[in-house]
Amino acid sequence: MAGPQQQPPYLHLAELTATQFLEIWKHFDADGNGYIEGKELENFFQELEKARKGSGMVSKSDNLGEKMKEFMQKYDKNSDGKIEMAELAQILPTEENFLLCFRQHVGSSTEFMEAWRKYDTDRSGYIEANELKGFLSDLLKKANRPYDEPKLQEYTQTILRMFDLNGDGKLGLSEMSRLLPVQENFLLKFQGMKLTSEEFNAIFTFYDKDGSGYIDENELDALLKDLYEKNKKEMNIQQLTSYRKSVMSLAEAEKLYRKDLEIVLCSEPPL
């Protein structure tokens, strides 16, 4: 049980700073899996109800179960019974609303990969703090949101604290992709079938018949189908087209190089 010193941040239904938003998220996502679910969701909802009553808001129903059902219908956009960070941003609007700014700019996986390509300039498989800062600066300009240097620094540090799961000061592609809504996050589809460097090199070499160091769109098509079949997973034509388009966003002149595909398919980004 939480003691008096461990009470959750008060859920004011007013504007929040990025730091306050993070405090609320970290408190309720106790297991750090990127969702609020189960008991976490129940605790979150109870605190939300307290905050609403504290601010004088009146609910239509006194039944907690009915309120939760109504709440989930409104905010659980992909109907998975969980609340993800981007969904929570709608419930608790932040002063800066940097998450929604981000999603507005990279609302699809294809746009996300194009943005990733632009800012992962050294092809390391990571966006580092200085690259992330430029990324966020561009997003804020695109959304016509005024900001100063200290505020931009706060956004950068907040995003790092949210998504830098191993604390190395960098954001990997899979970490950064958590900013996308689940239905747009094609990278999640490759979870559970990530390849070791040896496995990846073998499959890439198989499809790179001429040893050019890159594959084209048709070869990627075949590679993805092969990968799914080997892992006994189903994928329809629409999904295949979507995944291929997203991955090809990393290509140069329709050429997808080994290092770019390795970022997506390997369990660890290339060294």
UniProtKB/Swiss-Prot annotation:
Record-level GO cellular component terms: cytosol; dendriole; dendrite; nucleus; parallel fiber to Purkinje cell synapse; synapse; terminal bouton
Compartments (UniProt record): Synapse; Cell projection, Dendrite
Residues where Ca(2+) 1 binds: 29, 31, 33, 35, 40
Keywords: Calcium, Cell projection, Metal-binding, Phosphoprotein, Repeat, Synapse
CDD domains in UniProt: EFh_HEF_CR
InterPro entries per record: CALB2 (IPR029646), Calbindin_Ca-bind (IPR051001), EF-hand-dom_pair (IPR011992), EF_Hand_1_Ca_BS (IPR018247), EF_hand_dom (IPR002048)
A biological process term (GO) from this entry: regulation of synaptic plasticity
Binding site for Ca(2+) 3: 120, 122, 124, 126, 131
Binding residues for Ca(2+) 2: 76, 78, 80, 82, 87
GO molecular function, one term: calcium ion binding
Residue ranges annotated for the EF-hand domain, each copy included: 16-51, 63-98, 107-142, 151-186, 195-230, 235-270
Binding locations of Ca(2+) 4: 164, 166, 168, 170, 175
Binding site for Ca(2+) 5: 208, 210, 212, 214, 219
Modified residues (Phosphotyrosine): 214
Pfam families named in the record: EF-hand_1, EF-hand_7
PANTHER family in alphabetical order: CALBINDIN (PTHR19972), CALRETININ (PTHR19972:SF4)
Role this protein plays: Calcium-binding protein involved in calcium homeostasis and signal transduction. It plays a critical role in buffering intracellular calcium levels and modulating calcium-dependent signaling pathways. Predominantly expressed in specific neuronal populations, influences synaptic plasticity and neuronal excitability, contributing to learning and memory. During embryonic development, it facilitates neuronal differentiation and maturation.
Similarity remark: Belongs to the calbindin family.
Name under which the protein is recorded: Calretinin
